Amino acid sequence: MKILLLDNYDSFTYNLCDYLLQTGADCKVARNDALSLSEFENIDFEALVFSPGPKRPADAGLMPALIARYHDSVPMLGICLGHQALGEFFGAELVKAAMPMHGKTAEIRHSGHPLFENVPEHFTAMRYHSLLLRSLENTPLECIARTGAGEIMALAHRSLPLLGVQCHPESVLTDFGLQILKNWIKIAASARYAGIDRQTHGTLP
């Protein structure tokens, strides 16, 4: 699978790239302000990954425009800032977290979505963020992982291969981070994604 990793000026982007390469994928990295939208269209890629980064999605160069351009034709994975960008694009509200979580781990509970295949229902993940998506109500997105406090930690579009994780799978302090990325590659590569039986996993209210 040919992946284009959009670098939102995050210091761990190349850790993420290395993990993606370990899955067997081909991964190219481009800064979010390095190319025009038309230049991105000349790159040969089959899936998009949006890296973590500072500030808000609106400050992340071409990331919002790439989501608008490719959301209905290219599989996507948003991580931290990228997760927030996907949520905002589909109408979710991005708010300040009650407590900033920079370099802190948390226990995450997932719903059984294929993104978490072979990952225990409860696992530990690293968090670096002060903003989060408050609700996915009235959007085409579903929550597929939360903290014990109910904070949204992962989302999935209900009919498109678009996924987001607020935590950092590229961190060594995230359990099963590489497995999560392998699962996403499997989802992105599968032409049958839209036909997955949604009754095989739940959502988290």
Regions found by a protein language model. Name each.
Residues 13:
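Active-site-adjacent helical/loop segments in soluble small-molecule enzymes
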Residues 45-117, 181-183:
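Cysteine-nucleophile active-site neighborhood
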Residues 1-4:
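Extreme N-terminal starter segment of soluble prokaryotic enzymes
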Residues 172-205:
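Acyltransferase
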Residues 114-160:
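Catalytic beta-strand/loop cores that center a nucleophilic Ser/Cys/Thr
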Residues 17-26:
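Two-component/phosphorelay signaling modules centered on CheY-like receiver
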Residues 26-32:
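Short hydrophobic/Thr-rich beta-strand motif most characteristic of the beta2 strand and flanking loop
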Residues 35-44:
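Short amphipathic alpha-helix with an adjacent loop that forms part of the alpha/beta core around
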